[in-house]
Amino acid sequence: MRRHAAFTLVELLVVIAIISVLVAMLLPAVQAAREAARRSSCQNNLKQFGLALLNHEAALGYVPPGARMKFGAAGPQIGANANVALLPYLEQAALNASWDHYRSYWEQESIVLATPVPLFTCPSNDAQTISDQAFEDVGVPAGLRLATSDYAFSRGATDAWCLSNEYPSHENGLFHIVGEGFADVTTLQQISDGTSCTFAIGEAAGGEAWTVCTLPGCTAPEGRSRADVPWMVGNLSTAEIAAAGYPFTGIYGTTIEPLNKRPVTSTLVDNAGITDCRSSVDGGTDATSNFRSDHADGGFFLHCDGAVRFIGESIEPAIYRGLSTIAGDEAAP
């Protein structure tokens, strides 16, 4: 009787072991390839931001302000941030048409506020594209859902909320608040440090992995918040929110704190001193969050010439801060 050839148990185990070794060898390469693709997509997002900024400046003669502020009977009102002004230049015509530019961001339709923009999301970040953090304890309507962004506008080497005519600062970045009593809009011609040596936008990862702590230099996470950044908010008036246990981050980043600092420093606007534009090192009471990314060892930054470069965590603090200012007169790195 003829016997059919077959695998023995030992041979089968050897084959399984070989396959397991091959999978173990290939898996890191596959994961690395996927992360490389995510990094490339994140970098391309910032390049699109760069084109939008340059086109806005070419069309209107200035860079969109970080936000606009006006004072009324109800006190200071902080408008939407620069993302809203950039929508027409980011191929977001439909979303721009849905936005009521005569109303503040909190008066917009809820469906508009909850609309995520793919360009605002870095694929390496696993945060939600819509923040479900609840601020109703401090008067923000319950159930308000805000779509998020993984990118922040550069405030410079300062954590001050604003740039007052009374407190001009060589530490200022490209984006600041515009309104009566505050500095005027910024043009590319004002960047005396050179557009290729100046940050415009950097990464601002969010999600559960990025907890938040209060005040500059903090090291212990506090409250119930994570570093989610609503893409449209100029800034919430946040002293009450922080007091209620909701330290959170905003649409601006500063180099006064280290890149990828964890926990993330909260963004804080002190209502009582909202026109006091001093940084924390000058005795001010405000705070601005640090830049951070889910890429290993650094993060991507859009420069004012439209180029996107990866900045490592090991960068010298003085060089890092100098790259974020528009007229600090620092030596080029």
Enumerate the predicted regions with their spans.
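Surface-exposed loop/linker segments characteristic of extracytoplasmic
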Residues: 36-333
